[in-house]
């Protein structure tokens, strides 16, 4: 069963200065990798991607705004989970999503870490809904986690390569209308992603 929903915007040639500045803020010196990440989400939704973890113990960093921007771009293919949702045995409501976002993540038990790692590379998983039998479904979800806890929001071993961790500084400005401005630029962003060459190459 394919639950993927149409993206709510159509690409159109245009500029996206607010999105570009915001991406530069979130991804810093890795901004081209940030565009790669978004481009793969958009054009190759089945591609396996690392677990993106944005951390900062400071306020007004834009982490939640980043999640809301992803929701604006990908619409119903994005779901917001709590820590409790992620730990629940009932997962049918998010098994078919492209992006599973957790704000204020605190999944620092070993079983949490193992589940995230397994899901980040899984091709299929057992979906379970209340009152229904478990069933195996194709899984292509990617995780975006945000936390104010810089030390141990998720248990990550030293040699682990399935996480992409970014420490996000405070925004240099406070713009209450930033998300609305970026939403208006999404068609231009999508057009750019369709034309853009990836800056990185795929590795297993």
Where are these regions (language model features)?
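A short helix-turn-beta junction within AAA+ P-loop NTPase domains corresponding to the substrate/partner-engaging
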Residues: 153-173
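Catalytic acidic motif of RecA-like/P-loop NTPases
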Residues: 106-107, 117
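Conserved catalytic/switch belt of AAA+ P-loop NTPases
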Residues: 113-135
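Conserved Walker B
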Residues: 104-106, 123, 149-150
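AAA+/SF3 P-loop NTPase mechanochemical coupling elements
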Residues: 90-95, 128-146
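P-loop NTPase catalytic core of nucleic-acid-dependent motor ATPases
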Residues: 1-101, 113, 164-167, 193
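Short glycine-/polar-rich loops that comprise or flank the Walker A/P-loop
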Residues: 95-98, 139-142, 158-164
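Conserved alpha/beta core segments of nucleic-acid transaction machinery
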Residues: 195-204
